[in-house]
Amino acid sequence: MNKLTFLYMQGCPYCVKAKKALEELQGENEAYKAVETEWIDEDRNPQLVANLDYYYVPTIYMGDRKLYEAHPSDDYDKIRRSVKAALDEAL
């Protein structure tokens, strides 16, 4: 099983939606609870994200591979589908 790393920023509404989606999906599927997740605040930990290729948050990585990068037009359903796809890939 692989670890998912979520890059986020405080006050980001898309990041709040990603967190909500993760919690909902884990509530619906016990297997998702076994996936290790790490949340990195890019403002507080710039050294951890300096070499990563992304512009928008939230962004989800599995190892060094980017699985999802939010865009300003993404609605909750798009974010939820993307979080689910990342969880499925991590299993």
Task: Describe every region a protein language model picked out.
Residues M1-E28:
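Local sequence-structure signature of Cys/Sec-based thiol-disulfide redox active-site neighborhoods
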Residues N45-L48, Y76:
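A short acidic, often aromatic-flanked loop/helix-cap motif at beta-alpha or helix-coil junctions
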Residues K19-L22, E30-A34, Y61, R65, ...:
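Non-catalytic interaction surface on structured domains
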Residues Y8, A31-P46:
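Thiol-based oxidoreductase modules, predominantly thioredoxin-like and allied folds used
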Residues M62-L91:
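Non-catalytic, surface beta->alpha helical segment in thiol-disulfide oxidoreductase systems
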Residues V16-K20, N51-L52, D74:
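Generic recognition of short, well-ordered alpha-helical segments
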Residues N51-M62:
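Structural micro-motif
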Residues Q26-Y32, L87-A90:
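Alpha-helix termini
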